[in-house]
Amino acid sequence: MLHASTIWHLRSTPPRRKQWGHCDPHRILVASEVTTEITSPTPAPRAQVCGGQPWVTVLDPLSGHTGREAERHFATVSISAVELKYCHGWRPAGQRVPSKTATGQRTCAKPCQKPSTSKVILRAVADKGTCKYVSLATLKKAVSTTGYDMARNAYHFKRVLKGLVDKGSAGSFTLGKKQASKSKLKVKRQRQQRWRSGQRPFGQHRSLLGSKQGHKRLIKGVRRVAKCHCN
């Protein structure tokens, strides 16, 4: 029969290939004892709790120590040889995660968006100053300066501008042409109505011929001969 000390010695000396990288019950027992001794005072600023219990990483390997000698060596390990590590994503109370703004790099949560075309147009109209009118070229230049491609967004630009004019937000505008006066537009409208109703346009004289022959034209080179009435 084996003695109890012999069994303890056999358990404390695992094979060489399993000495590192595998679970060792003796080392787990000793590590738990050292953990309780180290963390009994106030934890260091970098100390933390992972799963309710602090965990440590021993920097000094225990090669060459077996059995009771390993236990004594573990008990005399200095605190400077133990590094308390952080769990992933955990920080002690009162300590914030260092942001990139503290190092001088400014980060934006959302990418900076360009203002809409309507806002750019309204801003250009509001900033016209003493000028009474704003040309279409000025509006296009303001939109293109914001970052829009006018060659691709020409149709969208006209639609937005027409919508603003219909709402009355941007006043009236002319697309490079002179608007006719109201009196000229009224005369033109009256002429169109007369032509549709069949009335004779203003300034056209009545034919000298009879009403029956008024719309008939005489053929060139043909003369009418006077009729003689014989009694």
From Swiss-Prot:
Domain H15: 113-177
Any single GO CC term annotated in Swiss-Prot or TrEMBL for this entry: nucleosome
UniProtKB keywords: Chromatin regulator, Chromosome, Developmental protein, Differentiation, DNA-binding, Nucleus, Phosphoprotein, Spermatogenesis, Transcription, Transcription regulation
Segments for region (Disordered): 177-214
The UniProt record lists the keyword Transcription: yes
SUPFAM superfamilies from the UniProt entry: Winged helix' DNA-binding domain (SSF46785)
UniProt entry tagged with the keyword Transcription: yes
Annotated compartments: Nucleus; Chromosome
Sites bearing Phosphoserine, chain numbering: S135
Compositionally biased region (Basic residues): 179-194
GO biological process: chromatin remodeling; chromosome condensation; germ cell development; heterochromatin formation; negative regulation of DNA recombination; nucleosome assembly; regulation of DNA-templated transcription; spermatogenesis
S-S pairs: none
Gene3D superfamilies recorded: Winged helix-like DNA-binding domain superfamily/Winged helix DNA-binding domain (1.10.10.10)
GO molecular function, one term: double-stranded DNA binding
Tissue specificity remark: Expressed exclusively in the testis.
Lineage top rank: taxon: Eukaryota
Family: Belongs to the histone H1/H5 family.
Described purpose of this protein according to its UniProt entry: DNA-binding protein that may be implicated in chromatin remodeling and/or transcriptional regulation during spermiogenesis, the process of spermatid maturation into spermatozoa.
Protein name: Putative histone H1.9
Taxonomic path: Eukaryota, Metazoa, Chordata, Craniata, Vertebrata
